[in-house]
Structures are given as C-alpha cells and as structure tokens.
Amino acid sequence: MAVSPELEGLRRIAPSRFLSFSFPNPFLGHASNPYGDGGGGGAGECIRVAVLDSPLPAPAVPRTAAMLVLAGRHRDWIFSTRAGHLHLLLSTRFSRLVLAGPELSAPSPPVIPCAARPDPDPAHARLLPLLLALCPMVAFRDNAVPEVPLLTFHDDLLRLAPVKFVTGPVVGEMVVEDVAIDSAPGSPELRRRLRFKRMPCLVQTQVRLCQLPAAAAASSSSSLMEALEGSGGFLQPDVGGSLVEPYLQAMVAGLAVIAPSIEKSIQSGVRPRCLCAGVGGGSLPMSIRVGLQFNVLGVEADGVVLDVARNHFGLVEDEFLHVHVGDAIQMIEDFSRRREPDMKFSAVMVDLDSSDAMCSVSAPPLEMIHGSVLLAARTILDQQGVLILNVIPPPADGSFYKGLVDVLHQVFAELYEIDVGNGENFVLTATVSPMETSLADNSGHFLTELRKLAGNFLEHIRRI
C-alpha cells in the first residue's frame, strides 16, 4: 500500500510539524468504543488523527504520547486546531502528541456533557498498533518497543453550550459559550466565557450567570443547570459582582500599592483615572468602575469584541466608563507625546496577550515590554501612579520573565509581584515613585472595597 509523503515523514521528528488524516475507526463494534454509535458527538466509520511535533529541541530518543478527544468536544478548538494541540503538547514532556477522536464533520450536541471520561485501558489496546506506527523510527533503536501512554484531558467543566460564533477583523473567530463549572463540594456554578480560536486554551473573559428574575419567579424550583439545559435566554451575566478569574483579582489587588493616594483622591471628590489596555468582555473595567468608583478608559483592538462584551457580558458605558477601538500600545505612546496634564492616570492596567498563536499562550505582547513603551506608560501616570501587567511567560522562553523584570526596574521606582498560583499568570505592579507607606496598613474605605474584588491576593503582594 502506498504511503503519502506526509505520513512517510513521520519517521522522524520535525519541529512544529502538524498534520491530520482520517483513519478507519479501530473502536467500531467493540465494547471499548468511547464514542458510541457516531451520533451526538460520536465517531463513525473513521476517526480523525492529528499529529504535532514539539517546537522544542527533541532528545536523542524522542517520546510520543496520545490523547483521546472527549466525546462531543471534537469540534472544540482545544482539540481541533493546531493552536490548541500545541498548548496540549507543551503542557507535557513529550516530543510528539497524537490526538484521536471523531471527524470534525460529526455533529456535536447543543449542550455537551463534559464530566464523563472513557476508560483508557481498553481504548489504548485498540489504538496501540496505530500509535506505534506513528512513533519516529529512532524510538525503536536496539529493537526496543516504545511506550506510548494515553494521556487524559481534565478541566473543571460539567456542561458546555456554545452560544454564538462571531469573527472580528483583528482577533479572528471567537466563541461565546455558557458552561457549568464543577465547584465541589458546593453546587455547580454557571459562567459565560469568551475564547478566541487563535488561542483556544485561554479564556479571554468569564462572568457568572444568573437567572432572569422573570424566569426565576416562573420556576422557582428549577436549578441553574436546568436553565443551561433549557435555553440561554433564561440566563444573564451577573455584572458588577466579584471577579471570577483569579488573575483579574490579582491585577485589581495591585492597586493596594497606591491605596493611600487613591483614598486621598476619593475623599477630595476626584475620581481616580484608569486606562485598561485590553477590554475583552469588560469584566475588569466594569468592576473598577462600579466597585472602586474609578473613571475608566478601555481600549480594545477589535470592535467586534466590544460588541460581544455589550451584547453578551453586560458591558455598559456611561460618563465614567468609556471604551474605544484601537491599538492600546499606540494610544499609550500617543498620550505620552501630548503630555497633557488632564491625560494623567492613577493606573494603567495591561491585559494583552501575544498575537502569535504559535508562541502558545503568552502575555503581554513583546511590543509592550520595549523600554520606550514602558517609558511612555510611565509618562502618562501621575506621580503616585502604577503600571499593572498581567504576565504569562511563554513556555519555550525561560528568559522572558527575567528580562521583563529587569527592564521594569530600569524604568520604574519600585516593582511588586503577585504569583496567581495557577502555574501560568503573574501580576507585576510598577510604581512611578517610591512608596512611603507599608502594605501592612489595612485602614481606609478604599482597601475595604478593594478586598471585595481582590479576595486574599492583597496578602500575596511582595516587592521584588
């Protein structure tokens, strides 16, 4: 049987090589079939097999692993795109990752159950001949038979219901989805999320969902889970409450560094001003405006993202919250060149990710950490101002974080760090001037309100 040149090339590791193909379903007619009869997210006569080689240098004997795509989630961008596949691969220590699941043409149910996990042992036995054939030749050196483990994907989802797919001119395809989160030992929590196809493993925004008052009154016994199963029309975002995402809580906590200055400003009747570089679904600017009484300017690169924020995440503009479409980094530089006194901010909060999906998830973009851009950000801050950055160091570049810390030390007076604790995010807070008060000072109305949004992250701020 003739083998295509692409498959023939799999005999060796080629950095970043990605290919996918259809293969006769080895589970068909067997009790080990994790996909049932092919309906509602199951696999039919063929399965989709996708192979990705790591962009990182391979060891002398590269290792291969495989993963079964969860039933019903085969069209989820985490499993169906190269960007999602790359994120999964980089979270392991393998040089090649094989994904096997239903073909993308197979339908998915409107509400996808996510809790069930197939028994990997019988499925592994059925897949093993294919997996061995997909190992590089060097893995068979000295007549060895390589081990190809079957990895398991875990997240905290119980249900997933796509609400709307839209495409923006800058970020490309995106999806709004309602999900049920496992909050054991408590009840499941419903949230609305926004994800981009170019970085499917990164949740751009998520907010809690609650039932519309009319729906809750009409069926007081119905649960939020039942509302999700029934119709998203019965649900609405819970706007103005505590922030869901820990890294956003940590970003807000960074304001504690200048709490005395903000307290003094509020007491004098002057609202502190904040520039939010990156709006997403609007959780951060809405919380700062509503919960902390800031005057907020948000800048988002893609107007479609702002439309999604207004229509699906409860973003409401008013005299104290304005959003603009544009390049946030360019706007920072433009403001700095004008040097207008009324354009000074108490805080500049940067929540921007890299636009290069092949770098996996990383933040902020490289343009943001140039010394000239950081100097421009310092210029538009007042004397007691802070620059707060959400940082996700790229997995393949261990020097990124140290380099960012070094350049911030060169431009700003002091630097503080919060480790979000999720293995990905760090929040860096850089001050224009040396701080004269201790972070241990817990007094003041502003800090009381800040704790409602930031949780216990105020206790994790450390100077570096």
Predicted feature locations:
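Aromatic/acidic cage segments in peptide-binding pockets
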Residues: 193-234, 409, 440-455
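Short loop/turn segments at secondary-structure transitions that flank enzyme active sites
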Residues: 182, 200-202, 302, 433-436
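Short beta-strand micro-motifs enriched in acidic
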Residues: 177-186, 418-420
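The AdoMet/dcAdoMet-binding core of the Class I SAM-like
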Residues: 2-29, 42-47, 51-165, 169-171, ...
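Short, solvent-exposed loop/turn elements at domain surfaces
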Residues: 78-79, 185-186, 202-206, 438
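Core SAM-dependent methyltransferase catalytic element
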Residues: 406, 410-464
